[in-house]
Amino acid sequence: MAKSWGETTGGSNDKIEFLKFNNGITRVRIVSGVLPRYVYWLTNKEGSVAPFECLRFNRDKESFVRGKADPVHELGFFEKELDKDGNRVPLKPKKNYIAFVIDRSDNKLKVMEVKATILKGIQSIMKQLNLATPFDIDISIEKKGKGFDTEYDVQQIAAMQFQIKLQDPNSAESKQYAADVDLIGEAMCDEDGDIIKFEKVPSLEQTYPVPTYEEQKEAIQAFMEGRENKDDDAKSGNSNAGSQKGIDQEAASDLDD
């Protein structure tokens, strides 16, 4: 299940885009919990890159299950670099925690990769502002550099300033949040008044179901042979995430280990 923002350690949804971080400031409103997962990035003969969820990773416990069957390893995918003894190393999965957000550049619902530094930054803001969730503030994230030198900075002062402006019912921020209801629906709260979810925001678990071993193996083989079909996203663990398959190499390379 999707984890709440405090506890994790680390509309129509027919087409859900992945948020692309460009150098500079990206501003988002988070509208879901965070879904823990690890993925393998595979490249087929046509040069296309696609993520396949690591079936050895337990989402709920946020840990790897030793000895669990893994079609990526069985099919013989390896790292490009050899180990210090000159031996081939089985391909390693990359952390790919995700959450639904509203991208303020176009006010569309998208999926954001919650990188380790972003997660820590958001949790720090929640602590500073005494928030149970980050749903009631916009988050500004600054990206610097590229590739393995990429850095992400969650701007705490901007979040504090936004929270103050949101208290004014006549502010642009308050009017934007009122308009967000058309996209995400009403907030659904628990008995303490804390937001659990938004009415129209789809379930991360249902959007990104964990495939069976057989389903994923077939999806990998189809992708590598260039014969993937419309069902392969679900079998790989990336239902409705076709746009992620076109993710650029830089975005893939700066994922967390």
Curated annotation (Swiss-Prot):
Disordered: annotated span: 222-257
Function: Required during DNA replication. Displaced viral DNA strands are transiently coated with the ssDNA-binding protein. It is then probably removed by the replisome that performs lagging strand synthesis or during the events that lead up to the recombination process.
Name of the protein: Probable ssDNA-binding protein
GO biological process: DNA replication; viral DNA genome replication
GO molecular function: DNA binding
Record's compositionally biased regions (Basic and acidic residues): 225-235
Species of provenance: Escherichia phage T5 (Enterobacteria phage T5)
Induction: Expressed in the early phase of the viral replicative cycle.
Keywords tagged on the record: DNA replication, DNA-binding, Early protein, Viral DNA replication
Tagged with keyword Lipid biosynthesis: no
Keyword DNA-binding set for record: yes
